[in-house]
Amino acid sequence: MPKNSKVVKRELDDDVTESVKDLLSNEDSADDAFKTSELIVDGQEEKDTDVEEGSEVEDERPAWSSKLQYILAQVGFSVGLGNVWRFPYLCQKNGGGAYLLPYLILLMVIGIPLFFLELSVGQRIRRGSIGVWNYISPKLGGIGFASCVVCYFVALYYNVIIGWSLFYFSQSFQQPLPWDQCPLVKNASHTFVEPECEQSSATTYYWYREALNISSSISESGGLNWKMTICLLAAWVMVCLAMIKGIQSSGKIIYFSSLFPYVVLICFLIRALLLNGSIDGIRHMFTPKLEIMLEPKVWREAATQVFFALGLGFGGVIAFSSYNKRDNNCHFDAVLVSFINFFTSVLATLVVFAVLGFKANVINEKCITQNSQTIMKFLKMGNISQDIIPHHINLSAVTAEDYHLVYDIIQKVKEEEFPALHLNSCKIEEELNKAVQGTGLAFIAFTEAMTHFPASPFWSVMFFLMLVNLGLGSMFGTIEGIVTPIVDTFKVRKEILTVICCLLAFCIGLIFVQRSGNYFVTMFDDYSATLPLLIVVILENIAVCFVYGIDKFMEDLKDMLGFAPSRYYYYMWKYVSPLMLLSLLIASVVNMGLSPPGYNAWIEDKASEEFLSYPTWGLVVCVSLVVFAVLPVPVVFIVRRFNLIDDSSGNLASVTYKRGRVLNEPVNLEGDDTSLIHGKISSEMPSPNFGKNIYRKQSGSPTLDTAPNGRYGIGYLMADIMPDMPESDL
């Protein structure tokens, strides 16, 4: 306290002493006095407030301009490319409509409770992932750092997919679409179709050769693909400009990036339902295969999809919710966003299989036409007798039903010779059973289907613009999960950090736009997030339930929400979720161990994919991705457990935010100014800097030199005076 304030101090000693006695006698009344007391420092009136109710740090924190903007941000983050190209594949692969039941069960058991937990801690503590877990326990601060590392790994390759979508978007403004037909190759004597394209398909060729110009293995880098390099740069510029002011800039874009995909999906669904074969695709999709539903693999894949669909463990959920008001109903938000995510997945599944049903119908018609012509040739050659063909069937204009009848007759009559005829059954179910996911769905199967659409360039533009928006919505949350914790912890300027983060990511991301870049995308997708995020969320669950205390956390929720949350969450968080997450982690490790580490390489000579194992250095990279992602957890624990680094400056976010003022401005303590009472500081904490908004008490309290354990925080002095005072709430 400055010297010229000592007179004021003496004049107020009696009143202040009485306030201090009240403070020490009753925690609740102390909290009220703490929030309402007014002190005169340097001749100015200042009002002390609780850190939760609006400290200087909190007052400066940005906030969502509306609840709708916040909900759209969470929806945009959780609803991503996986909803469009992974959920439909899993639904088809794991029993069709029957897959929805285990998915819904696991959404209720794992998804909503853990999503609610992340929303709650972010909103209650109002910090990013690093600050939140430092608050719970400084030794567990590595959880937040691990989330940041995983977010960065994912951002590196996720934005590459946005770059691919930008490339296809830019190529969609032409008629016909460039992937509609195979290119012709001319030489001195004649013109012929490109062999690689002829052996595969026009859309497959365009993806692998024109877009990626892919190499034959991960070891053949092949140099940079300049087209994709420019698209990647454009993607990072878009992300940087949208995030440079945090939620103040991204919040405006969220309205478009979150809502536009729904407009496109609904338009696609309406258009697809008007096409031949779309109903066949939807019927095939939702025909339940109950026998598959009981397989353990189905439940494991459903749990994994629930886990990643909501963005658990990334830190983006926590970062977004940290900008909420403390009394926001985050329970409602958790349920609402979770079910919006689920219904988006179902909507995308309807669209995908309506379109694929149309595509299968087109391919099936071509198949029937070609095989009917083959049968007619056999009839002319005498290989097949005309007598076995029903008289009412005209093979020149045969229907699918009549063709299948002829096919079955020939198969019975020519049972021994039938394989040599090389006839195809041409059943639409066989085409629909060809499971496609990921880039194969978006850039090959879907693009092929759109070439048969009337006004195909328009639909192509809409589709890839939708993919860009879905990707950007998820990228906003991912980057927020990186930037917000670092800004909260190290107090750097958000604008500078965002630019550096995006620039560095673009430079590192150049490995993904080599000719072998697609293989690195596969590697990062398989190894950089799955296991690390599971470990992070398990530790989050343990930190809240067993370190902070589940009973205390439930009381915090009651105080924050204004009502007691259902005991259902108590049992889910404490018992069910940890066990299921641990089981999922073990199953994922076992599955990863049983699956040979490798990737599908495009072999130009064969014009097909071939599974290749990673080289030795590739295996080292795979292991390193997992290790580096989880390494912050043990490192931070060891550093803080054994005090290996002087953490007093707060550089490692050592300050936990207990009830009381967080002091930012240092003052000089003189004489019996050492008797100032700040509030309650955890005994695990390094000493904080003293600020000017502080309580005062009479001289005679323990001096700084007598603080417990040789520490000199005023919070320890208060602990000596009243050792039985209970820990404050979150």
UniProtKB/Swiss-Prot annotation:
CDD domains found in the cross-reference section: SLC6sbd_SBAT1
Gene: SLC6A15
Subcellular location: Membrane
InterPro entries per record: B(0)AT2 (IPR042934), Na/ntran_symport (IPR000175), Neutral_aa_SLC6 (IPR002438), SNS_sf (IPR037272)
Protein known as: Sodium-dependent neutral amino acid transporter B(0)AT2
Function: Functions as a sodium-dependent neutral amino acid transporter. Exhibits preference for the branched-chain amino acids, particularly leucine, valine and isoleucine and methionine. Can also transport low-affinity substrates such as alanine, phenylalanine, glutamine and pipecolic acid. Mediates the saturable, pH-sensitive and electrogenic cotransport of proline and sodium ions with a stoichiometry of 1:1. May have a role as transporter for neurotransmitter precursors into neurons. In contrast to other members of the neurotransmitter transporter family, does not appear to be chloride-dependent.
Pfam families cross-referenced by the UniProt entry: SNF
Top-level taxon of the source organism: Eukaryota
Biological process annotations from GO: L-leucine transport; neurotransmitter transport; neutral amino acid transport; proline transport
Keywords: Amino-acid transport, Glycoprotein, Ion transport, Membrane, Neurotransmitter transport, Phosphoprotein, Sodium, Sodium transport, Symport, Transmembrane, Transmembrane helix, Transport
Keyword check for Transmembrane: yes
Gene Ontology cellular component list: membrane; plasma membrane
Record family assignment: Belongs to the sodium:neurotransmitter symporter (SNF) (TC 2.A.22) family. SLC6A15 subfamily.
Cytoplasmic face residues: 170-223, 356-458
Sites bearing Phosphoserine, chain numbering: 25, 55, 687, 699, 701
Catalytic reaction annotation: L-leucine(in) + Na(+)(in) = L-leucine(out) + Na(+)(out); L-isoleucine(in) + Na(+)(in) = L-isoleucine(out) + Na(+)(out); L-methionine(in) + Na(+)(in) = L-methionine(out) + Na(+)(out); L-proline(in) + Na(+)(in) = L-proline(out) + Na(+)(out)
Residues carrying a glycan: 276
Sequence intervals crossing the membrane: 71-91, 97-117, 149-169, 224-244, 253-273, 302-322, 335-355, 459-479, 494-514, 530-550, 575-595, 619-639
Sequence ranges on the Extracellular membrane side: 1-70, 640-730
Membrane topology: Multi-pass membrane protein
Region: Disordered, residue numbers: 1-24
GO molecular function: branched-chain amino acid:sodium symporter activity; neutral L-amino acid:sodium symporter activity; proline:sodium symporter activity
PROSITE patterns: NA_NEUROTRAN_SYMP_1, NA_NEUROTRAN_SYMP_2, NA_NEUROTRAN_SYMP_3
